[in-house]
Amino acid sequence: MAIERTFSIIKPDAVAKNHIGAIYNRFETAGLKIIASKMVHLSQEQAEGFYAEHSERPFFGALVAFMTSGPIMVQTLEGENAVLAHREILGATNPAEAAEGTIRADFAESIDENAAHGSDSVASAEREIAYFFSTEELCPRTR
């Protein structure tokens, strides 16, 4: 199996409800290691840049407004098949369709405020990690 890195966001709704620790526990229980983490309050420019691929979609303005509404936690996770493993832990984008026991089923209220984001591919993960973290901020776990 391949050791990969993936990018994750705990969104403003889950941060506001103090779910950070519970969500981190889910990552670690699944064998994903947190190798970088920080709290950020995105500016409009940062949010628009991060979600630029959605700029022509009808939900873009609401997404940017939501993602700038409060602090978020951004983290880089490392582990075997990390991209897929993380997405499985998150559950379906729409919490109404998310499997029982997933982060979105347990912590999200709606498709718009769905608790967390996860990279959808290794290429996306690399781009998203670099958007928030310098190489020096990544701390591979050696123990």
Swiss-Prot record:
SMART domains in UniProt: NDK
Residues that bind ATP: 11, 59, 87, 93, 104, 114
Signal peptide range: none
Catalytic activity: a 2'-deoxyribonucleoside 5'-diphosphate + ATP = a 2'-deoxyribonucleoside 5'-triphosphate + ADP; a ribonucleoside 5'-diphosphate + ATP = a ribonucleoside 5'-triphosphate + ADP
Gene Ontology, cellular component aspect: cytoplasm
Annotated compartments: Cytoplasm
This protein's record includes keyword Cell wall biogenesis/degradation: no
EC numbers, comma separated: 2.7.4.6
Sorted UniProt keywords: ATP-binding, Cytoplasm, Kinase, Magnesium, Metal-binding, Nucleotide metabolism, Nucleotide-binding, Phosphoprotein, Transferase
Active site (record annotation): 117
PROSITE patterns, per the entry: NDPK, NDPK_LIKE
Major location (coarse): cytoplasm
Database matches in Pfam families: NDK
UniProt xrefs under PANTHER family: NUCLEOSIDE DIPHOSPHATE KINASE, NUCLEOSIDE DIPHOSPHATE KINASE DDB_G0292928-RELATED
Function: Major role in the synthesis of nucleoside triphosphates other than ATP. The ATP gamma phosphate is transferred to the NDP beta phosphate via a ping-pong mechanism, using a phosphorylated active-site intermediate.
Membership in a protein family: Belongs to the NDK family.
Name assigned to this protein: Nucleoside diphosphate kinase
